[in-house]
Amino acid sequence: MAKFVLNQNLPDLGGPPLYPGPTGSARSPSSPYSVETPYGFHLDLDFLKYVEEIERGPASRRTPGPPHARRPRASRTGLAGARSPGAWTSSESLASDDGGASGALSPGAFPGLSLPPLSPRSLSRNPRVEHTLLETSRRLEQAQARERALSPARAVTRSPRGSGRSSPAPNPALASPGPAQLQLVREQMAAALRRLRELEDQARALPELQEQVRALRAEKARLLAGRVQPEQEVEIEARPDKLAQLRRLTERLATSDRGVRSRASPRAEDPDGLAARRSEGALQVLDPGSRTPDGEPRTRETGTEVVPETREVDAQAVPETGEAGVEVVPETVEVDTWVTEELLGLPEAAERELELLRTSLEHQRGVSELLRGRLRELEEAHEAAVTRPQSRDVAAQTTLGCTEKTTQTELPVENQPRPTAGDEMAPVGILKSIMKKKDGIPGAQSSQGPKSLQFVGVLNGEYESSSSEDGNSDDEDGVAEHPRSSSSGSDDSSGGSDAGTPGPHNDKDAGDCELETHPELTAGREGRCELNPRLREACIALNQQLNRPRGVTSRDGNAARLVAQEWFRVSSQKRSQAESVAGVLRGVKSLGPELLAYVVNLADGNGNTALHYSVSHGNLAISSLLLDTGVCDVNHQNRAGYSALMLAALTSVGQEEEDMAVAQRLFSMGDVNAKASQTGQTALMLAISHGHQDMVAALLECGADVNVQDADGATALMCASEYGRLDTVQLLLAQPGCDLTILDNEGTSALAIALEAEQDEVAALLHAHLTSNHQGQSSTGSPTAKECNDK
């Protein structure tokens, strides 16, 4: 608000320089920058422009631009003091809005000021002055109209005070407010502006809240759409209760909203006693029905009076909305629990595992169907054999005893000639072989799988390898624990004892005895190729694929898969017979050397070959047959990083000279210093850690290096010292080049490891050996020094 105060430093307003005379003034009457008024005064046009800017109020002050220079107010003060109440009725339009200057510029403010006589020229009308005054009045009315439109509160406050144009002079009865009241009004207006800014900030946050509400509604719709399940009927039965609960929540929210509006309806009155009541249109803004679909108020042009009320009620209603949202959360969570894994999708690993299981089941179904067909054929053959004349029963029984060893051939009935009695009774032997398959010896893939390499798992951190018959074997590879970390490694479990019993199965019956009494039949069987027609056809197809330049491809996998299944079934079971393996090897060798090398070195999903399985099961006779082929890869490592040579170091052959000969032959054909891919251990370290003294001696005879270090920097001597194997330590110390000063990755020697493990005997032996070595070096060094001195 502009407030004009009389400046006491102005010159005398009644002096001669303000009136035109013969001597002239600072400005000439004809100057284009001044206008002569009807009272004979000259008004500066710049001063009139300055007055107009003051009258326009805050709108003009907010306009950017360079500030105007303030001119002296002498002419306006002189004009206000010299005018008469009735001469110029629109003189108050040039006063300020608060009316404070009108009292200071009233005619009675300067009683001693005498007016000069009016000149004849002052009585004449000046069109330029009238045009200027009319333009000023028009602009003032426009500014006041705009201000009333933008701020109704200020317009209501200003409404009791007249503009001055409706009355010729101010009424002394209506006294203008004092400076204290005006200052209080200004403070209230400043507080209202600050509150308005705060509410505007809150209004800016409304779109974000509305966006969150829309997102929650979309999420709720998505969850409701995903509830299409077989138990949807139960959901429909429980839906009325939920709808009733939602209705109750809605009623509570509406009640709280009405309470908030009723609490927010009163409004403080201003100091002038004028209460700014809220209009009905402002209340409609709070009604949810009066909002647009986006949530914005429909009447945003209601001015500053409506905006504070709307924002204030929203700010108070936010906690209620948050409370309702918290109560609705359990419903959303309950809907989320109805989403099953079918809608979310299974992980890729689970899908792959399910696919492998499906493939395995399909394969087992096919094998079962094949076995059922063979069983039906053999039952028919058995019935035919039973109905034979009694005179042939004796020969049939004798032939049965002789041909029981040929049950693994599985020759079909229709392909066997039937001229002799022995050939007629061949189906009976085949029937017995199929019954063994039903018990789980050759064909039960699920029962024999986990037993493969079982003792290796017990002795080496539960390493397990699945059966070779299962094309989709588990990927449990790797030794979980370092052998040095388990002190119980020397104690063989049941799996180890099973592996330690070499040789074929001891379950011999009368048929085996009769087989030994008929050498001519055995010789005749050995000359035959032990391949059934189905396996023979697959081997021929596989041999043709191997002879091609591109080799075996993925599209040619049927023959290779069949050969692998039959090969592992015959050679890699715990009860596999060396005779059957020998027959298959002869049949494969007759088809070609490339096929023989391919079949002997076939590996399953875990990287285990027939040599791995035969060594781990203790079937060293089969291992000898595989080594006799001359194409067996002895150094092939499985996925756990172990070769058949390393597995042989874990077995215990006892007093069996033949098995020890096979083990020594295996050690001599392979690399005894090869390291496991995961732990870096050698066969010597494995044999020492499991307490197989005979294998340690055999490895040392084959040239095993005692100073080789594993991934942790440990040597074979450190392993023996840690486990307290005194005999092994003596055997290692007897080897030439055994270094006791080697340190592992932690900077520990074999002597320190023995002391830490409280192996006193081993520590004493190592200390004595170190002392003897130092004394020997010193004794051999002194004569050399003496000879040097003599020379």
Swiss-Prot record:
Keywords: ANK repeat, Coiled coil, Phosphoprotein, Repeat. Residues 127-149, 254-280, 293-312, 505-514 have a biased composition (Basic and acidic residues). InterPro entries: Ankyrin_rpt (IPR002110), Ankyrin_rpt-contain_sf (IPR036770), KANK1-4 (IPR047184), KN_motif (IPR021939). SMART domains: ANK. PROSITE patterns: ANK_REP_REGION, ANK_REPEAT. ANK repeats lie at residues 606-636, 640-677, 679-708, 712-742, 746-775. The modification Phosphoserine is found at residues 151, 159, 163, 166-167, 176, 279. It comes from the Eukaryota. Residues 180-229 form a coiled coil. GO terms for cellular component: cytoplasm. Residues 1-37, 56-181, 254-312, 401-425, 463-514, 772-791 are annotated as: Disordered. Residues 25-34, 401-410, 772-783 have a biased composition (Polar residues). Residues 105-125, 158-180, 485-496 have a biased composition (Low complexity). GO terms for biological process: negative regulation of actin filament polymerization; negative regulation of stress fiber assembly. May be involved in the control of cytoskeleton formation by regulating actin polymerization. This is KN motif and ankyrin repeat domain-containing protein 3. It comes from Mus musculus (Mouse). The gene is Kank3.
